[in-house]
């Protein structure tokens, strides 16, 4: 999803992928800790 900051990615990553962490890079969420 499009993001402004990394905090917008945490919930998205948890729900969609089960990953526990995420970062906003180039306005796109990248998920980590899968």
Swiss-Prot record:
It is found in: Secreted. The keyword Disulfide bond applies. One of its GO terms (cellular component) is extracellular region. This toxin reversibly blocks Shaker B potassium-channels (expressed in insect Sf9 cells) with a Kd of 96.6 nM, and presents an even better affinity toward hKv1.3 (KCNA3), blocking it with a Kd of 17.7 nM. Has the structural arrangement of an alpha-helix connected to antiparallel beta-sheets by disulfide bonds (CS-alpha/beta). Belongs to the short scorpion toxin superfamily. Potassium channel inhibitor family. Alpha-KTx 06 subfamily. Protein described in PubMed:18502464 elutes at 21.73 minutes, whereas protein described in PubMed:23684923 elutes at 21.22 minutes. This is Potassium channel toxin alpha-KTx 6.17. It comes from Opisthacanthus cayaporum (South American scorpion).
